[in-house]
Amino acid sequence: MSKLKITGGNPLFGKVEISGAKNAAVAILPATIMASKGVCTIENTPNIEDVHCIERILNGLGCEIKRQSNSILQIDSTNITKTDANTEDVRKMRASYYLIGALLGRFKKARVELPGGCPIGVRPIDQHIKGFEALGAHVEIEHGAVIVKADKLIGTNIFFDVVSVGATINVMLAATLAEGNTVLENVAKEPHVVDVANFLNSMGANIKGAGTDIIRVTGVKELKGCTYSVIPDQIEAGTYMIATAACGGEVTINNVIPKHLESITAKLIEMGVDVIENGDSVTVKSKGNFKGANIKTQPYPGFPTDVQQPMSTLLTIAKGRSIVNESIWESRFKHVDELKKMGANIKVEGRTAIIDGVPKLTGAIVKATDLRAGAAMVIAGLLAEGDTEILGVEHIDRGYPNIENKFRSLGATIVRL
């Protein structure tokens, strides 16, 4: 298994291009299953392991996939007949549950192995099941697989008990090809929810209200292929913003939607970091001298849970005490023990981390326990004194394209071994 070696202490300067959004791509690609006519050309897809994993899954189901470049995929799902997704790729990747909504919508049946992904606590799919059943599907969980069947899907009103990105997207997928009108309430508003809705509409769906509290879906009889470009990745952008703040320097982060970054931008400015918005880019200027802040993760437009771990790393060297409350996922402090190896002063109580800033971190051998923890450890290595080796790089590769090359272009000393 490969690892990253980082010699810390270099300020970051230059420009970095942000790739397409992982969280959008891993839903849009399964949604191409629903196009019974024509070819879907998906542009600005990130060149990451999670996308490669979905490519393999779709191939196994009978989709014809042509990769035109590192960021453009052509997917022809017209001849797909298989509705049983049971490979190891399905089991290891959480976003494979979007196959359920896509297959149920088009074929009115699906069997999908229960998915995996990052080990960050209990991540149930009860709200997905509630939505599918409300549309008229029969749902069973048997031998580690979700089995859904329906004679037909009928639109209805569905109120989610909790705000769930996955359930919002999955039920929206199924409702797109249901009969009549579906109203989804207490839905997630994340940018990638809106992106999936926009993609479905480009295929011929009738979805209104994505990004608001209520999504209204008028069912259509079929969807057709289209050309669509995935939105920029707000989490990747936030990671480079935080890294620049931590290391000092000046970096312009291109191909972003600044509105999607507002909660991150506001927190960095509160800490004393300069952030300048310029159309489709943001520039971060930092002297490496900033104060602590309190963070509470919340659904969009609140502070994103996927940026909590990188931000926690920044706070380890901030002046004063910071309190981080993780309200979205339990067990998302697995990076803390690794940061402690580098000299961080952090105490975890339940879903809260109390961080007292220290003058510096020092290099150590650490591991990436999950995707965003991996990004946190890269930032820790960049800001630390001395050499850091990061094991478990496969987690990082799931969501960050060419992370070592991008940081190296900014002046970091980082290599893959």
Swiss-Prot record:
Positions bearing 2-(S-cysteinyl)pyruvic acid O-phosphothioketal: C118
Pathway: Cell wall biogenesis; peptidoglycan biosynthesis
Residues the entry annotates as binding UDP-N-acetyl-alpha-D-glucosamine: R94, R123, P124, I125, D126, Q127, D306, I328
UniProt catalytic activity: phosphoenolpyruvate + UDP-N-acetyl-alpha-D-glucosamine = UDP-N-acetyl-3-O-(1-carboxyvinyl)-alpha-D-glucosamine + phosphate
Residues binding phosphoenolpyruvate, per UniProt: K22, N23
InterPro entries: Enolpyruvate_Tfrase_dom, Enolpyruvate_Tfrase_sf, MurA_subfamily, RNA3'P_cycl/enolpyr_Trfase_a/b, UDP_GlcNAc_COvinyl_MurA
Active site annotation, chain numbering: C118 (proton donor)
Major enzyme class: transferase
A GO MF term: UDP-N-acetylglucosamine 1-carboxyvinyltransferase activity
Keywords per UniProt: Cell cycle, Cell division, Cell shape, Cell wall biogenesis/degradation, Cytoplasm, Peptidoglycan synthesis, Pyruvate, Transferase
Domain of life per record: Bacteria
Gene3D superfamilies, sorted: Enolpyruvate transferase domain
CDD domains associated with the record: UdpNAET
UniProt main location, coarse: cytoplasm
EC number per UniProt: 2.5.1.7
Intracellular or extracellular location(s): Cytoplasm
GO cellular component: cytoplasm
Cytoplasm among keywords: yes
GO biological process, one term: cell division
Family to which this protein belongs: Belongs to the EPSP synthase family. MurA subfamily.
Function comment: Cell wall formation. Adds enolpyruvyl to UDP-N-acetylglucosamine.
Record's protein name: UDP-N-acetylglucosamine 1-carboxyvinyltransferase
Organism from which the protein derives: Clostridium botulinum (strain ATCC 19397 / Type A)
